[in-house]
């Protein structure tokens, strides 16, 4: 055994521990270099030992665009909170946003440029210099551009907005390529299409939950994962508790109880894919009851003739009395609001469903008034780029082009379709046919592992950028993100990488900026110049400093709001196609309901240990994937909690343990999205299963979006058990009569005892 003398032992103890913390044991010889704690030779400008400094920036953990404020000490980020001045989140921040520090300090970050040395996908890489990596990419792109083959270059990015999106567009325009795609599994393309069809507007509306008195949600988990949950949570709370008049009433319609369903006054389970029929049945009743008397009333009556309450009740499984009661309450409460999304929008008739929800708002008079649906004005900065959001059809077409040799270079910016796109799109096979794949990701995700070159980007806490939230908050808003710490590793900002490539390709005139910060300043100078003389700052420098310091800016001289004009042909086109499912009901008796969680999102949170340890708010499960089954269904199949089942669709199969969950329809099973990574670091790899991988390529014909709620599955009991890690115990009484019952299920003595408790009920 190697010996160590007293003096060396004391040195090790002074370094932090008796050797163990340094990565080796005392029983072994010391082979690793000694690491010293070196103070700043040139400390940051605002460095003050022991004094915290706060920087305002923008959260990019999802697409909501919340403002954040980051506490730093001694040049290190310590805590992230919401920016109180930002109108989207107003000082609040979700758990995923709080975990942004673990993106910055994640031990699995890519720390330097790398080039592939082994077979593609083998994980064999070597470090290279930035000059070498950028030159390899620039030389290939320059050659393609000179030969007029620019359209063989594809830039595939996560969803980005603002001047970075504009920079991508300018770069690809110079390449002569129209293949700039933004792909995210969560992009609400169906909602955009429905609003474009019904209103002729391309922007998402503002849903005024704060001022509504009656909310009908058709599948939209507005408190959990839908569009901007922090902002919607604020509106929900104020409608419920901060009103001087009657508190808002909330009704949630969905096949599986979400966070929003648990917080609602009433949860209603409609047959999957029939939510739009329910909306039209309510609209039919409003017309029949005289709740709408507009000049186009007769046209609406004719259009909705087939959606009587009786026929809708038969289709949806919801009693006619319930439909009439909801319709009356919705029409008679002012203001009221109907929203749609989530699984209701994830069916083959998703666009029809959301158009029906818009029609319900129109007939109830909820358009353009506080507490209803308000369309946002145009963003303060609109990108004039070639970019477009890619859906399943677009990605399948890209894969087909790659297999046919029409894609020579693929550049990836934090997009991970290997995890978030069903295999039926053919994307994995397509990668084998692309000569050069370049990734700008900060992590080794599934798609980055297939790259030839990796040019790793800074995290959002190390970068300059900006954002213009979509949907807005009723007036134009812009946010600026700034570096809150110096870069930890040999990485570069995404915008700076693109600008350096442009310089090496001789595109200085088209993209003349030295770095992303300079591009931002020039872009925000245009915004400053548009402001009225009465509201603008004394100089641009004063304006820029104030925006960076505050982290947010709102346009004081708002533009005229878009008018609510319904296309004349829309009323005649109102119809609900029956939902189509992949797999016949005999062989595949259950409808798979994949859902987003507020921790994992589309899987991007899986490499953050805080998110892995955060209990699911509805089931209290952590760390894995599970299959939620109704108790009646579980009993009929002989299943209990922890039974390992095989979930099989027409596209594949996966295994997960059973979790008996009473808040789900008997013919529906639910699985959370986010786990099942084969790469993406130590915290995410080989944990749980990914239900996206067994989704069938069932599309919404109107848009090409994936109908991700339209896959049928069957369950096969493997006879094995798996331990579910839960923090919430069980939801069953085990015969102990813990939960007292009232109504027909209660005994007369128990009923009398419950009714003896003095309860005051607020008037409706």
Language model region names:
Residues 426-427, 432-445, 483-495, 499, ...:
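Phosphate/diphosphate-binding loops
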Residues 259, 445-480:
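Flexible glycine/proline-rich, aromatic-decorated loop/lid segments
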Residues 352-355, 518-618:
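Long, low-complexity segments enriched in small/aliphatic residues
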Residues 330-404, 471, 558, 564-569:
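A glycine-rich, hydrophobic/aromatic-adjacent loop/helix-cap motif
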Residues 402-405, 415, 419-449, 453-462, ...:
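Hydrophobic alpha/beta core scaffold segments
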Residues 225-246, 356, 423-437, 474-476:
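A short, gly/pro- and small-residue-rich
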Residues 120-126, 284, 288-318, 484-561, ...:
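N-terminal leader/propeptide and maturation segments of large enzyme subunits in energy/redox metabolism
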Residues 1-289, 299, 310, 319-323, ...:
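N-terminal export/assembly segments and adjacent metallocofactor-ligating motifs
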């Amino acid at each position: 055994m190697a010996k160590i003398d007293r003096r060396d032992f004391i040195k090790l103890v002074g370094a932090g521990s008796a050797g163990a913390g340094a990565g080796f044991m005392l029983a072994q010889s010391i082979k690793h270099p000694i690491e010293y704690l070196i103070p700043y030779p040139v400390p940051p400008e605002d460095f003050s030992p022991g004094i915290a400094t706060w920087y305002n920036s923008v959260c990019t953990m999802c697409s909501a665009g919340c403002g954040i404020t980051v506490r730093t000490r001694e040049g290190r980020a310590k805590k992230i909170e919401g920016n109180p001045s930002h109108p989207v989140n107003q000082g609040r921040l979700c758990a995923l946003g709080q975990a942004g520090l673990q993106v910055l300090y994640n031990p699995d970050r890519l720390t330097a440029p790398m080039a592939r040395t082994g077979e593609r996908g083998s994980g064999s890489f070597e470090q290279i210099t930035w000059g070498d990596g950028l030159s390899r990419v620039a030389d290939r792109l320059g050659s393609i551009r000179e030969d007029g083959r620019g359209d063989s270059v594809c830039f595939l990015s996560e969803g980005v907005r603002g001047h970075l999106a504009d920079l991508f567009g300018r770069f690809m325009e110079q390449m002569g390529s129209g293949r700039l795609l933004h792909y995210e599994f969560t992009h609400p393309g169906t909602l955009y299409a429905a609003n474009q069809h019904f209103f002729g507007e391309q922007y998402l509306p503002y849903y005024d939950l704060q001022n509504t008195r009656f909310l009908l949600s058709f599948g939209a988990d507005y408190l959990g994962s839908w569009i901007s949950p922090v902002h919607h949570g604020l509106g929900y709370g104020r409608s419920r508790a901060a009103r001087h008049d009657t508190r808002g009433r909330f009704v949630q319609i969905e096949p599986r109880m979400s966070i929003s369903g648990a917080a609602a006054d009433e949860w209603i389970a409609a047959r999957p894919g029939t939510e739009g029929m329910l909306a039209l049945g309510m609209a039919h009743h409003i017309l029949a009851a005289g709740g709408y008397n507009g000049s186009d009333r007769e046209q609406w009556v004719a259009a909705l003739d087939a959606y009587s309450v009786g026929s809708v009740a038969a289709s949806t499984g919801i009693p006619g009395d319930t439909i009439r009661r909801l319709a009356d309450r919705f029409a008679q409460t002012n203001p009221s609001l109907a929203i749609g999304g989530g699984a209701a929008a994830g069916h083959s008739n998703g666009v029809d469903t959301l158009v029906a929800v818009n029609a319900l708002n129109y007939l109830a008079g909820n358009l353009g008034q506080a507490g209803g649906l308000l369309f946002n004005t145009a963003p303060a900065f609109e990108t004039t780029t070639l970019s477009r959001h890619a859906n399943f059809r677009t990605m399948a077409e890209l894969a087909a082009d790659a297999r046919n040799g029409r894609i020579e270079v693929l550049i990836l910016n934090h997009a991970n379709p290997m995890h978030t796109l069903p295999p039926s799109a053919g994307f994995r096979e397509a990668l084998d046919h692309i000569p050069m794949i370049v990734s700008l990701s900060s992590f080794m995700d599934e798609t980055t592992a297939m790259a030839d070159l990796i040019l790793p980007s800074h995290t959002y806490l190390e970068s300059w950028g900006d954002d213009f939230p979509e949907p807005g908050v009723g007036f134009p808003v812009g946010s600026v993100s700034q570096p809150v710490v110096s870069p930890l590793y040999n990485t570069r900002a995404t915008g700076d990488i693109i600008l350096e490539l442009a310089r090496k390709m001789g595109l200085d005139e088209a993209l003349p900026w030295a770095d992303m910060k300079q591009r931002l300043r020039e872009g925000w100078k245009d915004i400053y110049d548009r402001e009225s003389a009465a509201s603008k700052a004394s100089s641009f420098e004063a304006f820029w400093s104030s925006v960076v310091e505050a982290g947010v800016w709102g346009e004081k001289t708002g533009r005229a709001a878009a008018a609510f004009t319904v296309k004349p042909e829309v009323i005649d086109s109102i119809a609900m196609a029956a939902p189509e499912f992949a797999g016949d009901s005999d062989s595949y008796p259950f409808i798979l309901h994949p859902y987003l969680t507020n921790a994992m999102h589309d899987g991007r949170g899986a490499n953050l240990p805080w998110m892995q340890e955060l209990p699911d708010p509805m089931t209290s499960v952590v760390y894995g994937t599970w299959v939620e089954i109704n108790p009646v269904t579980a009993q009929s199949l002989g299943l209990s909690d922890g039974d390992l089942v095989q979930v099989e669709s027409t596209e594949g199969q996966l295994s997960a343990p059973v979790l008996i969950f009473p808040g789900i329809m008997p013919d529906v099973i639910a699985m959370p999205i986010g786990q099942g990574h084969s790469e993406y670091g130590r915290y995410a790899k080989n944990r749980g299963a990914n239900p996206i991988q067994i989704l069938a390529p069932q599309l919404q014909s109107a848009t090409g979006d994936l109908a991700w709620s339209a896959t049928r599955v069957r369950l096969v009991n493997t006879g094995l058990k798996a331990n579910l890690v839960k923090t919430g115990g069980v939801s069953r009484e085990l015969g102990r009569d813990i939960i007292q019952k009232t109504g027909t299920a209660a005994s007369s003595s128990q009923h009398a005892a419950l009714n003896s408790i003095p309860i005051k009920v607020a008037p409706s």
